[in-house]
Amino acid sequence: MKKLVLASGNAGKLGELRAMLAGVALQITAQGEFGVQDVPETGLTFIENALIKARHACLMTGFPALADDSGLIVDALGGAPGLYSARYAGTPTDAAANNAKLLEMLRDVPAGRRCARFYAVIVLLRHAEDPQPLIADGCWEGEIAFEPCGSGGFGYNPIFFDPLYGMTAAQMGAELKNKISHRARALERLRDCLHTFMA
């Protein structure tokens, strides 16, 4: 069984990725189990940040690495918080503060103009100098609620409302969320490549 390092220190993200990859015959190990710390995300795009994280994990562990970068894109805010989703309200990262800041920024934006999407890109590097990384992305369309609702998930989940299901991401069960989320869609696109990778 091949070993794959998940290049993330985010426990919520790590749990989601592990759950979604449960059926794949890989030994998945978090980078923290190797003593690897998060690397600064200095890229200008989600893809660049995912590559930076995957390359760092490969260099530090000697194993193939899977990394994702994701964020919330709000049309009424010109794409913010975008790349800065985790640090929107400043550092250290604080989900409740991020949610509060976003709701404040949208205070005067009416229903129907609060369109948003979660976007994720997932990168798989076979080794640190892999010239042909496997890259997949996924998007989850929704809108920003007027107040937090639900206790599941993490990050912006309490204020990200999916009109098709009539609930926020935080109100969804993990099974549903892990089928329709931006990460789930990106992983689904990467799944065939993972089977080739394992061969």
From Swiss-Prot:
Enumerate the cofactors the protein uses. Mg(2+)
* Catalytic reaction(s) noted: XTP + H2O = XMP + diphosphate + H(+); dITP + H2O = dIMP + diphosphate + H(+); ITP + H2O = IMP + diphosphate + H(+)
Enumerate the InterPro entries for this protein: dITP/XTP_pyrophosphatase, ITPase-like_fam, RdgB/HAM1
Q: Which UniProt keywords apply?
A: Hydrolase, Magnesium, Metal-binding, Nucleotide metabolism, Nucleotide-binding
Gene Ontology annotations of biological process type: nucleotide metabolic process; purine nucleoside triphosphate catabolic process
Q: How is the cofactor bound?
A: Binds 1 Mg(2+) ion per subunit.
Write one Gene Ontology MF term: dITP diphosphatase activity
Q: Which domain of life is it from?
A: Bacteria
Q: Per the record's keyword annotation, is Heme included, yes or no?
A: no
Q: What is its EC number?
A: 3.6.1.66
Residues the entry annotates as binding substrate: 8-13, 70, 154-157, 177, 182-183
Active-site residue numbers: 69
Pfam families for this protein: Ham1p_like
Q: How does it assemble?
A: Homodimer.
Family statement drawn from the similarity comment of this UniProt entry: Belongs to the HAM1 NTPase family.
PANTHER family per the UniProt record, alphabetical:
INOSINE TRIPHOSPHATE PYROPHOSPHATASE, INOSINE TRIPHOSPHATE PYROPHOSPHATASE/HAM1 PROTEIN
Protein name in the entry: dITP/XTP pyrophosphatase
Source species: Xylella fastidiosa (strain Temecula1 / ATCC 700964)
